[in-house]
């Protein structure tokens, strides 16, 4: 994409910034270098001020509240979009406000700085601001996956504050549900205070509610996860019919299933997403969810290419085609709720995008799409599938084969730099951990403090410069001066 090299270089610079004063400019040592067409003010950085905002994104005209941990006398803040300064003001104390401009779908960067006696500007801290009335225009997706007794209100507030600092504007709730065919813990009329998820972990309904409420207070949206075609082994007792399943053969005797450990509740048996009765059934179960939990939409999942599968009558099932009618049925039942559907290894991607009913595109990439060149291929295809209107989020599980310890920081940052520069974003940040597995509660790898700091800077860059990275533009061929003999892997 145009500017990819410059965008990646800028992100690497952000990650390498330190608290040491690193003078740039030089020259006459006065209030700025003169000569040529413009005056240039020398600038240096001393990133010692930590900044936060009260929300992950704002509507045009909304009040943005900033907080700083400490400010020196004479500090000022400057607001700019790309290279255009919008306004600036003096700041004192630890908090101040700014009215978001009227222009919608725009990224801004706030620089807090002071001016030295020689005229050099010292940047003390920076933070991005996203002014967008619809979060799906520039989705920055995170997740939560644990809802046990440890998730107190204060703990949830702390976790969501970090996601807010990274401008995460949508959060996927993974492994929150009771059963795939009956997601709500309890009934519409009577919720269970505690229930078991598929792995027999405790799920506290109040924790789920608290996550949603606190996310909304930060301006985030909450999306519940579920398969489009999953049922547990007790589904018949909950009204799921045998005729709704898909089978490995034409004789409707061997149900297709996703096998799970014996210690878990059940294997997951697969239904026909295109079956109208199943669609009506699960849409009603979703209605029970929406009636009790203030979710903003449904993150639909699938399991990729299953090979030849058959319905109860022995007809071959075209799964990508059934995804279309499933999405349309879900939107028809809840037109005001958002929908996103996973394209596992791009399976069904064109059909999903072609519905016109999903709000952005979501690709879970696996070994057959593990090169950086594959990310470009996916984004280019999605751009066509979505009529140049839908953004792409990648679910790419980092350091997948590493058993314990910390994430490989250079690998994380390189992957993010490539994804962001291409115009995508990366589902990787959770409330309490970074994602390393398709089983989202897996916490075997930890983020170092250095990685946490770098990630904040990367997400500031993606947000502040979203109009450069993710808002159209033309593709331009770039000649690389570096030859890589082997593909670069995620």
Write out the residue ranges for each language-model feature:
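Bacterial Sec-dependent N-terminal signal peptides
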Residues: 3, 14-46
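An acidic-aromatic substrate-binding cleft motif
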Residues: 124-179
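Active-site-adjacent "subsite" loops/lids of carbohydrate-active enzymes
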Residues: 134-139, 144-153, 224, 228-293
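Aromatic-lined carbohydrate-binding/catalytic grooves of carbohydrate-active enzymes
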Residues: 160, 164-206, 230-249, 260-278, ...
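Aromatic/acidic polysaccharide-binding cleft in carbohydrate-active enzymes
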Residues: 388-474
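Residue-level detector of conserved catalytic or cofactor/ligand-binding positions
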Residues: 482-490
